[in-house]
């Protein structure tokens, strides 16, 4: 009997031991494998970390990297670890003080001012961030109408902030506590405390041993050239409109996107796909294991891992050598004009801004594009406040967004309209009488510029001579002969006032026609488009307003005998490792204006004489070049005090065009002087000559 009792006791002990072992193993499973960090006695935490994908490079047509990435470090919090530590507030307080001591900015998205009197700053945040804030209040059962000061009192109690801390100290720590809680409320990835921290500051901060603060490898956008600022573009955080668009594309709310230039235009190619990493850490923040999360199909089958995928590389049509030549030459000419010691004439000294565009005639590829004044994209963030204070708005991209009157550079368009409609025959002579008196009895009698300045005329001239000397009288007569519709149709077919197709945002400008007059002067006596308007439009005045980019398309179309190509900056897209072609851009023909060989020869020969003729308005500009150039100068009245605007268009070689160049200067006085910029570009393009000659101001050059 006693033996049986002992056996029963042993059996009971074994059963009890098995029960204890079972629950011990279950508890181990809960703590080690399945913990979510919600209990105080957990020993590990499993979190998901978004791993940012590297952005693709931007290159020029020769493979030079214009914008790339450099390796950097971010400081990221595992919020489970820091909030489970014994002295969360004190650790955060020390961390914040160290950052303030080092002058290091950190991320804090609590929409309340940092100092008293506390006020909301919701207007500074996107719709998504404002939504997260409201969700936070709801999850914490806090009235959404609560004032900022009352909310600060509420959160101070909620997070057990010591009474002896100042309101500002409390606000700083509460900002971080809010970030931690937001991760659980809104299911966000780990909180990035500091981005791109320097090695020195990283070492100083790591010495604090702040629980849960981890170092993550990352990348930062880096510009490799001080040139092309207006077209390379900038990066920035998303606003509410951006978020509405990119959320559907899988972007994280705090993703940085292209805001302007190439960065914005080619966002779809450059942006990579972020990955998701699983981190298992102990209560001290020590990493136990890390791996990328599995990707499953609709049936739950594992089909891969969610690792980051770098963005593709974009090869642009830009030629960095030509870009450098264009920007340097443009700056040289502007500074030359502004300097009384070099520019002895007063005209042009008040020059303000300028732009230049270089385009490949047969493809529409933009080889260079510059706007003056400019800025250094490498130091853009540091210099931003100073840039805003500079004269003439360096941030304004004049090549795309400034619409100017073309002046006499428009005259080839008028000639084409007259010849293609049979209103002017090859070789026909028109006598310049100085004053166009046909409508004098109606109060309209425009003058030729040489008559205005010197009381002389050009006499009997044909179309080629009229282009050479830029005779306004000749083109007044052509403008009177042709219909408004014929002139407008020709200008449109040549690309003036039309979208260029360029990937960057652009201003459309407008052509001088009946529709434009009604639009600009609705309800006034100036709303009509009369004969006088058409005659002035024929020399590039009246309401003609075009961007330098549109003028580049126009000039290329002239060179291409009426074939208008889509303007583009995109050459091709290749994979992140350069091993495969993703997309190759092909030249696109937009439209064709039928221009006969006789018409083409007439205006090309006339434009050649602008350079080579004895009276050419730019005869001194291209002196010394080995390549023949077809050009047209332009002087456009501004209707304001100061110098006239200046324009210069050309293509080369004249007999088999490869490139078209447009230079425009605000209050530059004469287009002929701007031809110096084109000359420098042509020298580099054809000769590879980086030496830019001295600026030569051409006196008495009109057009």
Predicted features and spans:
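Gram-negative outer-membrane assembly/targeting C-terminal domains
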Residues: 689-703
């Amino acid at each position: 009997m006693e033996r049986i009792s002992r056996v029963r006791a042993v059996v009971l002990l074994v059963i009890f031991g098995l029960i204890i072992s079972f629950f011990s193993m279950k508890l181990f499973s809960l703590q080690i494998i399945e913990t979510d960090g919600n209990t105080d006695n957990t020993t590990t935490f499993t979190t998901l970390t978004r791993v940012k994908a590297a952005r693709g490079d931007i290159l020029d047509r020769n493979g030079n990297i214009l914008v790339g990435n450099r390796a950097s470090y971010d400081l990221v919090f595992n919020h489970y670890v820091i909030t489970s530590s014994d002295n969360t507030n004190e650790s955060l307080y020390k961390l914040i003080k160290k950052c303030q001591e080092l002058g290091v900015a950190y991320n804090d998205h609590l929409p309340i001012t940092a100092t008293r009197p506390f006020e909301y700053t919701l207007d500074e945040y996107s719709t998504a961030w404002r939504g997260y804030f409201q969700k936070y209040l709801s999850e914490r059962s806090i009235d959404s109408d609560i004032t900022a000061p009352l909310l600060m009192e509420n959160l101070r109690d909620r997070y057990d902030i010591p009474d002896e801390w100042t309101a500002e100290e409390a606000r700083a720590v509460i900002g971080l506590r809010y970030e931690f809680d937001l991760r659980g409320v809104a299911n966000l990835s780990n909180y990035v405390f500091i981005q791109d921290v320097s090695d020195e500051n990283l070492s100083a901060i790591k010495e604090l041993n702040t629980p849960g603060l981890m170092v993550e490898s990352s990348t930062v956008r880096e510009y490799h050239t001080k040139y092309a600022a207006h077209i390379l573009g900038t990066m920035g955080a998303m606003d509410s409109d951006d978020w509405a668009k990119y959320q559907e594309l899988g972007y994280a709310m705090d993703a940085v996107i292209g805001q302007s230039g190439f960065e914005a235009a080619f966002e779809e190619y450059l942006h990579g796909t972020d990955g998701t990493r699983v981190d298992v850490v102990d209560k001290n923040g020590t990493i136990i294991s890390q791996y990328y999360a599995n990707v499953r199909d609709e049936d739950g089958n594992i089909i891969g891992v969610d690792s980051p995928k770098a963005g593709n590389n974009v090869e642009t049509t830009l030629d960095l050598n030509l870009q450098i030549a264009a920007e340097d030459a443009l700056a040289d000419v502007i500074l030359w004009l502004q300097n009384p010691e070099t520019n002895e004439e007063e005209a042009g000294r008040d020059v303000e801004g300028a732009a230049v565009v270089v385009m490949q005639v047969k493809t529409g590829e933009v080889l260079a594009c510059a706007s003056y004044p400019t800025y250094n994209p490498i130091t853009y963030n540091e210099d931003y406040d100073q840039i805003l204070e500079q004269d003439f708005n360096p941030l304004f991209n004049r090549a795309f967004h400034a619409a100017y009157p073309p002046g006499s550079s428009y005259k080839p368009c008028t000639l084409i309209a007259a010849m293609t409609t049979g209103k002017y025959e090859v070789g026909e002579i028109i006598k310049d009488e100085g004053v166009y008196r046909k409508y004098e009895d109606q109060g309209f009698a425009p003058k030729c510029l040489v008559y205005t300045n010197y009381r002389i005329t050009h006499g009997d001239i044909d179309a080629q001579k009229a282009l050479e000397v830029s005779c306004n009288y000749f083109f007044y007569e052509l403008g009177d002969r042709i219909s408004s519709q014929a002139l407008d149709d020709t200008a449109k077919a040549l690309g003036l006032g039309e979208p260029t197709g360029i990937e960057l945002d652009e201003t459309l400008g407008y052509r001088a026609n009946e529709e434009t007059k009604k639009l600009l002067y609705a309800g006034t006596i100036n709303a009509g488009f009369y004969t006088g308007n058409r005659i002035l439009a024929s020399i590039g005045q009246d309401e003609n307003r075009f961007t330098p980019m549109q003028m580049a398309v126009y000039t290329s179309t002239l060179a291409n005998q009426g074939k208008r190509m889509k303007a583009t900056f995109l050459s091709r897209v290749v994979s992140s490792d350069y091993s495969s072609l993703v997309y190759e851009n092909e030249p696109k023909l937009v439209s064709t204006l039928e221009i006969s060989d006789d018409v083409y020869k007439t205006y090309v020969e006339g434009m050649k004489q602008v350079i080579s003729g004895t009276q050419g308005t730019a005869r001194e500009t291209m002196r010394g070049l080995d390549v023949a150039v077809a050009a047209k100068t332009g002087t456009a009245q501004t209707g304001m005090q100061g110098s006239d605007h200046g324009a210069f268009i050309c293509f080369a070689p004249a007999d088999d065009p490869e490139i078209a160049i447009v230079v425009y200067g605000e209050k530059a006085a004469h287009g002929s002087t701007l031809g110096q910029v084109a000359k420098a570009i042509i020298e580099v393009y054809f000769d590879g000559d980086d030496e830019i000659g001295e600026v030569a101001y051409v006196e008495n050059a009109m057009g």
